[in-house]
């Protein structure tokens, strides 16, 4: 009779293992934006969760992130900082939004409107999170030297979608973060198709 409790434990461990496998198939994207009207931290599980009042430019970034690949991202940890200069945003890793990201789980970060200076600062911050905070996270950065496996360096200069809209390197990091987050661990995203694009400027080798 003493062994009656063992099957329950076996089922519980098995269920936990299945849950971990399912989570690994769909990672979490962290996305940091600035907006003239909206501010706060939001957990998005689908496009229907996009906060009201965001600019069309910011909504487009969330849409890009949710495109994913085999799967969509499990969720997006969205940080929106209110700024009167949202058209030319500046980001500070000591701001409340970035402090919030230190306290929640996410896998891939994109800050699509960060300039070169802020991108370097954010890259340093992400490296620090992995070493001092023991977080398992990566930063999809635009044109940052790939000197650390926690930094994913995206360098394509110009992308044009089927409607004719063009994206610069940094603007498209949301799409890349979502694509990687939606890639199951048993396959590679190296040759993942981007069906929304009509043109990608070739990289000079």
Predicted stretch roles:
Residues 1-26:
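Short, intrinsically disordered N-terminal pre-domain segments
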Residues 35-111, 119:
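An N-terminal, globular interaction/scaffold subdomain
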Residues 24-27, 75, 135-139:
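Positively charged, low-complexity intrinsically disordered regions
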Residues 32-35, 89, 100-205:
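A glycine- and small-residue-enriched flexible loop/hinge signal that marks low-structured segments
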Residues 1, 81-83, 116, 158:
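Interface-prone segments of viral and bacterial extracellular assemblies
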């Amino acid at each position: 009779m003493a062994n009656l409790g063992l099957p329950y434990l076996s089922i519980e461990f098995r269920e936990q293992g299945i849950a971990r496998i399912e989570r690994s198939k769909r990672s979490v994207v962290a996305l940091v934006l600035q907006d003239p009207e909206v501010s706060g931290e939001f957990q998005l599980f689908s496009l229907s969760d996009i906060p009201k009042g965001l600019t069309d430019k910011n909504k487009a970034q969330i849409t890009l992130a949710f495109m994913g690949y085999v799967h969509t991202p499990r969720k997006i940890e969205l940080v929106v900082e209110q700024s009167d200069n949202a058209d030319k945003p500046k980001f500070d890793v000591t701001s409340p939004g970035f402090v919030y990201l230190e306290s929640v789980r996410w896998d891939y970060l994109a800050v699509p409107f960060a300039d070169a200076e802020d991108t370097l600062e954010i890259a340093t911050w992400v490296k620090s999170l992995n070493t001092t905070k023991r977080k398992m996270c990566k930063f999809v950065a635009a044109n940052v030297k790939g000197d650390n496996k926690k930094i994913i360096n995206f360098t394509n200069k110009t992308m044009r979608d089927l409607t004719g809209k063009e994206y610069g390197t940094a603007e498209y990091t949301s799409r890349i973060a979502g694509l990687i987050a939606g890639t199951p661990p048993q396959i590679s995203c190296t040759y993942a198709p981007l069906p929304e694009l009509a043109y990608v400027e070739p990289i000079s080798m």
